[in-house]
Amino acid sequence: MKRFVDRIIIHCTATRADVDYTLENVNRDHQAAFGKNCQYHVFIRKDGTIHRANDFNVVTWHTGGINNRQGIGICYEGGIMAKGNPANPKDAIDTRTPQQKESLIVAIKEAMAWAGGTVKAIKGHRDTSPDKNGNGTIEPAEWVKMCPCFDAIPEYKHLLQ
Protein backbone atom coordinates (compact mmCIF):
# COMPACT_ATOMS: atom_id res chain seq x y z
CA MET A 1 0.00 0.00 0.00
CA LYS A 2 1.29 3.44 -0.94
CA ARG A 3 1.68 5.84 1.99
CA PHE A 4 0.01 9.25 2.10
CA VAL A 5 2.41 12.16 1.56
CA ASP A 6 1.31 15.79 1.82
CA ARG A 7 4.60 17.59 2.45
CA ILE A 8 8.17 17.76 1.26
CA ILE A 9 10.79 18.82 3.77
CA ILE A 10 14.04 20.36 2.51
CA HIS A 11 17.21 19.80 4.52
CA CYS A 12 20.90 20.59 4.38
CA THR A 13 23.71 18.50 5.84
CA ALA A 14 24.94 21.49 7.90
CA THR A 15 28.44 20.87 6.60
CA ARG A 16 30.99 23.37 5.34
CA ALA A 17 30.85 24.42 1.70
CA ASP A 18 34.60 23.78 1.37
CA VAL A 19 34.40 20.16 2.58
CA ASP A 20 32.98 17.23 0.61
CA TYR A 21 30.24 15.28 2.38
CA THR A 22 29.15 12.18 0.50
CA LEU A 23 26.23 9.79 0.82
CA GLU A 24 28.67 7.44 2.54
CA ASN A 25 29.31 10.18 5.14
CA VAL A 26 25.56 10.64 5.63
CA ASN A 27 25.13 6.87 6.05
CA ARG A 28 27.94 6.75 8.62
CA ASP A 29 26.57 9.68 10.62
CA HIS A 30 22.96 8.47 10.50
CA GLN A 31 24.07 4.96 11.53
CA ALA A 32 25.71 6.52 14.58
CA ALA A 33 22.71 8.74 15.39
CA PHE A 34 19.74 6.54 14.41
CA GLY A 35 21.13 3.04 13.88
CA LYS A 36 20.07 3.23 10.22
CA ASN A 37 21.56 4.50 6.96
CA CYS A 38 20.59 7.83 5.39
CA GLN A 39 17.26 9.06 6.71
CA TYR A 40 16.56 11.34 3.75
CA HIS A 41 14.79 10.07 0.66
CA VAL A 42 16.98 12.11 -1.67
CA PHE A 43 20.52 13.44 -1.21
CA ILE A 44 22.00 16.02 -3.59
CA ARG A 45 25.74 16.59 -3.93
CA LYS A 46 27.35 19.96 -4.70
CA ASP A 47 27.78 18.94 -8.34
CA GLY A 48 24.02 18.32 -8.58
CA THR A 49 24.22 14.53 -8.52
CA ILE A 50 20.94 13.16 -7.17
CA HIS A 51 21.09 10.05 -4.97
CA ARG A 52 17.86 8.21 -4.16
CA ALA A 53 18.75 7.05 -0.66
CA ASN A 54 15.33 5.62 0.22
CA ASP A 55 12.16 4.68 -1.63
CA PHE A 56 9.50 7.37 -1.26
CA ASN A 57 7.16 4.78 0.25
CA VAL A 58 9.52 4.26 3.21
CA VAL A 59 8.96 6.38 6.33
CA THR A 60 12.34 7.79 7.37
CA TRP A 61 13.42 9.77 10.43
CA HIS A 62 14.40 13.12 8.90
CA THR A 63 12.31 15.63 10.83
CA GLY A 64 10.00 14.22 13.48
CA GLY A 65 6.46 12.95 14.02
CA ILE A 66 3.90 13.63 11.30
CA ASN A 67 6.55 15.28 9.13
CA ASN A 68 8.20 11.86 8.85
CA ARG A 69 4.99 9.87 8.43
CA GLN A 70 3.51 12.19 5.80
CA GLY A 71 6.65 13.74 4.37
CA ILE A 72 9.48 13.16 1.94
CA GLY A 73 12.90 14.43 3.01
CA ILE A 74 15.23 15.94 0.42
CA CYS A 75 18.70 17.04 1.55
CA TYR A 76 21.47 19.01 -0.15
CA GLU A 77 25.15 18.87 0.75
CA GLY A 78 26.25 22.05 2.54
CA GLY A 79 24.60 24.84 4.49
CA ILE A 80 27.65 26.16 6.37
CA MET A 81 30.00 28.79 4.95
CA ALA A 82 33.52 27.77 3.96
CA LYS A 83 35.74 27.68 7.06
CA GLY A 84 32.56 28.04 9.13
CA ASN A 85 31.55 26.27 12.33
CA PRO A 86 28.36 24.16 12.17
CA ALA A 87 27.73 24.97 15.85
CA ASN A 88 27.57 28.72 15.07
CA PRO A 89 24.17 29.76 13.64
CA LYS A 90 25.81 32.84 12.06
CA ASP A 91 27.80 30.50 9.80
CA ALA A 92 24.63 28.86 8.43
CA ILE A 93 24.10 30.26 4.92
CA ASP A 94 22.64 29.22 1.61
CA THR A 95 25.55 27.37 -0.03
CA ARG A 96 23.51 25.73 -2.81
CA THR A 97 25.33 25.60 -6.10
CA PRO A 98 23.45 26.33 -9.34
CA GLN A 99 23.53 22.57 -10.01
CA GLN A 100 22.01 21.83 -6.60
CA LYS A 101 19.26 24.39 -7.16
CA GLU A 102 18.34 22.68 -10.44
CA SER A 103 18.52 19.21 -8.90
CA LEU A 104 16.39 20.23 -5.94
CA ILE A 105 13.60 21.23 -8.33
CA VAL A 106 13.99 17.95 -10.24
CA ALA A 107 13.83 15.95 -6.99
CA ILE A 108 10.84 17.92 -5.67
CA LYS A 109 8.92 17.40 -8.92
CA GLU A 110 9.75 13.68 -8.84
CA ALA A 111 8.49 13.41 -5.25
CA MET A 112 5.34 15.35 -6.09
CA ALA A 113 4.64 13.11 -9.08
CA TRP A 114 5.10 10.03 -6.90
CA ALA A 115 2.70 11.45 -4.28
CA GLY A 116 0.04 11.86 -6.97
CA GLY A 117 -1.17 15.39 -6.30
CA THR A 118 -1.42 15.24 -2.50
CA VAL A 119 1.56 17.51 -1.68
CA LYS A 120 0.27 20.75 -0.14
CA ALA A 121 3.50 22.11 1.38
CA ILE A 122 7.19 22.35 0.55
CA LYS A 123 9.13 23.73 3.49
CA GLY A 124 12.45 23.70 5.23
CA HIS A 125 13.28 21.64 8.29
CA ARG A 126 13.33 24.87 10.33
CA ASP A 127 9.72 25.53 9.28
CA THR A 128 8.64 22.44 11.23
CA SER A 129 9.76 24.02 14.52
CA PRO A 130 7.10 24.65 17.18
CA ASP A 131 5.12 27.90 16.89
CA LYS A 132 5.93 28.93 20.46
CA ASN A 133 3.97 32.20 20.45
CA GLY A 134 0.97 30.68 18.65
CA ASN A 135 0.73 33.36 15.97
CA GLY A 136 0.60 30.85 13.10
CA THR A 137 4.06 31.71 11.77
CA ILE A 138 7.32 29.95 12.57
CA GLU A 139 9.65 32.90 13.15
CA PRO A 140 13.48 32.87 13.27
CA ALA A 141 13.50 33.08 17.07
CA GLU A 142 11.45 29.84 17.13
CA TRP A 143 13.63 27.81 14.76
CA VAL A 144 15.06 24.71 16.40
CA LYS A 145 17.77 24.70 13.72
CA MET A 146 18.72 26.80 10.69
CA CYS A 147 18.32 23.94 8.19
CA PRO A 148 18.04 24.27 5.20
CA CYS A 149 19.72 27.71 5.53
CA PHE A 150 17.36 29.39 3.03
CA ASP A 151 13.64 30.14 2.95
CA ALA A 152 12.21 27.11 1.16
CA ILE A 153 8.54 28.10 1.39
CA PRO A 154 8.64 31.07 -1.02
CA GLU A 155 11.42 29.48 -3.09
CA TYR A 156 9.24 26.52 -4.09
CA LYS A 157 5.74 28.02 -3.78
CA HIS A 158 5.38 28.10 -7.58
CA LEU A 159 5.69 24.30 -7.70
CA LEU A 160 2.48 23.94 -5.69
CA GLN A 161 0.36 25.99 -8.09
Which positions does each model-derived feature cover?
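A short, polar/proline- and glycine-enriched secondary-structure boundary/capping micro-motif
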Residues: 21, 61-69
